[in-house]
Structures are given as structure tokens and as C-alpha cells.
Amino acid sequence: MSAISRDEVAHLARLARLALTDAELDGYAGQLDAILGHVSQISAVSTDELDEVDATSSPLDAVNVTRPDVIAECLTPEEALAAAPRVAEGRFAVPQILGEEE
């Protein structure tokens, strides 16, 4: 017997506001039934031995890789603004997007 019926798929489709054809309802019912079968198999796996295994967040001994924080030359404000299409009061000028009437 199927774990999920065509009517249940139709109900889920209505809840999700999806318009499905009869063929799609039948197809999805079969696909969801197969998925639920796989979930059932996974749920049946014994986890008794897992109590002996320490929990880990990562199986790798990865560490943060960083470069030295060295002070270096950077652009002057004039150099940074030189290629800007518009500048206002020593800043990049961009079109206003907030507070405008629609």
C-alpha cells in the first residue's frame, strides 16, 4: 500500500497553491511514496553504536588560514574617487533609492 495517496498530493498542492494536472498528481504520488520509503529505511537503521562515537562538527582538522596583517600603501581619497561617475562632497554620489514616492 502506498504511504501517500493521490488525494493527499492534491491536498498538499492546494495548500502550496500549485495547479497540478492529473498526470502530475499521479507522478508526484509515486515519487513521494518512493521518498517516504527511503526515509523509512533510513529511520530503521540502528543507532545504538553511535553512542560510542564522539560528536564532531567537522571530520577535518581544518584551521583558519590567514595572512599577516601588514600595513601597506592604499589609495588616497582623490585616487579612489577619480574614476567615479559622480562625486559629491568628497564621496561617491549615487541615485537615492529610499524615501522616494512610488
Curated annotation (Swiss-Prot):
UniProt-listed Pfam families: GatC (PF02686)
GO molecular function: asparaginyl-tRNA synthase (glutamine-hydrolyzing) activity; ATP binding; glutaminyl-tRNA synthase (glutamine-hydrolyzing) activity
Alphabetical UniProt keywords: ATP-binding, Ligase, Nucleotide-binding, Protein biosynthesis
E.C. numbers: 6.3.5.-
Keyword flag ATP-binding: yes
Group of enzyme by EC: ligase
Record flagged with keyword Metal-binding: no
Record GO biological process: glutaminyl-tRNAGln biosynthesis via transamidation; regulation of translational fidelity; translation
Reaction catalysed by this enzyme: L-glutamyl-tRNA(Gln) + L-glutamine + ATP + H2O = L-glutaminyl-tRNA(Gln) + L-glutamate + ADP + phosphate + H(+); L-aspartyl-tRNA(Asn) + L-glutamine + ATP + H2O = L-asparaginyl-tRNA(Asn) + L-glutamate + ADP + phosphate + 2 H(+)
Family membership noted in the UniProt record: Belongs to the GatC family.
Subunit structure: Heterotrimer of A, B and C subunits.
HAMAP family: GatC
UniProt xrefs under NCBIfam families: gatC
Described function: Allows the formation of correctly charged Asn-tRNA(Asn) or Gln-tRNA(Gln) through the transamidation of misacylated Asp-tRNA(Asn) or Glu-tRNA(Gln) in organisms which lack either or both of asparaginyl-tRNA or glutaminyl-tRNA synthetases. The reaction takes place in the presence of glutamine and ATP through an activated phospho-Asp-tRNA(Asn) or phospho-Glu-tRNA(Gln).
Protein name: Aspartyl/glutamyl-tRNA(Asn/Gln) amidotransferase subunit C
Originating species: Mycobacteroides abscessus (strain ATCC 19977 / DSM 44196 / CCUG 20993 / CIP 104536 / JCM 13569 / NCTC 13031 / TMC 1543 / L948)
Recorded name of the encoding gene: gatC
